[in-house]
Swiss-Prot record:
Localization per record: Endoplasmic reticulum membrane; Golgi apparatus membrane
Function: Required to generate and maintain the structure of the tubular endoplasmic reticulum network and the vacuole. Induces high curvature in membranes and causes membrane tubule formation. Involved in membrane/vesicle trafficking.
Transmembrane spans: 36-55, 58-78, 89-105, 109-127
Keyword Endoplasmic reticulum among UniProt keywords: yes
The protein's name in its UniProt record: Protein YOP1
Species this chain originates from: Kluyveromyces lactis (strain ATCC 8585 / CBS 2359 / DSM 70799 / NBRC 1267 / NRRL Y-1140 / WM37)
Positions in the Cytoplasmic compartment: 1-35, 79-88, 128-180
Gene coding for it: YOP1
Length: 180
């Protein structure tokens, strides 16, 4: 039990140091005399509580907001990296997010069968969106890849052949003296 308490306290200290320069949290900390980490944890708890109780349907917009903003941030960061390791994770996320958005067309039926759907959706989306959890990789290897390999075969040759033909035509045009 002490290990979990130590881990939680270390996480709170990490939040305090990570958000040390945030002016809004500094102002709240000065007014309430609470550490920044308590304010952050409290705001996150209220956010999840609003999603959980879904008063006036606010759970849907809050769930979709967090499901869009956090992965968008990671996607913008991934566009600036040279490696493709984060691309698979983010593409998997956006496939799942799109699938859930299409399924939610029948949201009244979903809410009838799954009363806390928006809360579960938010937790699941955070699980697959945050790279350190590795949820997107698990969803990709267990669900998406087997399904797509079986039902959506990708034909590699057609696009490659077309690219080769275009390149050959461009080279022929250059060789014959064509210039812009």
């Amino acid at each position: 039990m002490a290990d979990y308490l130590k881990l939680f306290q270390d996480s709170l200290k990490g939040l305090d140091t990570k958000f040390a320069g945030n002016q809004i949290l500094s102002r709240i900390e000065a007014q309430t005399k609470l550490p920044r980490s308590y304010v952050i944890v409290g705001l996150v708890a209220v956010y999840f509580l609003l999603i959980f109780i879904n008063v006036g349907g606010i759970g849907e917009i809050l769930s979709n907001f967090v499901g869009f903003c956090i992965p968008t941030y990671y996607s913008l960061k991934a566009l600036k990296t040279a490696t493709s390791t984060d691309d698979t994770q983010l593409l998997t996320y956006w496939i799942v997010f799109s699938f859930l958005s299409v399924i939610e067309f029948w949201s009244k039926a979903i809410l009838y069968w799954v009363p806390f759907y928006w809360f579960f959706k938010t937790v699941f989306l955070l699980y697959i969106a945050i790279p350190s959890f590795g949820g997107a990789q698990l969803v990709y290897t267990r669900l998406i890849s087997p399904f797509s390999d079986k039902y959506l075969p990708i034909v590699e040759g057609k696009s490659g052949e077309l690219a080769q033909k275009v390149e050959a035509a461009a080279n022929n045009a250059k060789a014959s003296g064509y210039s812009r």
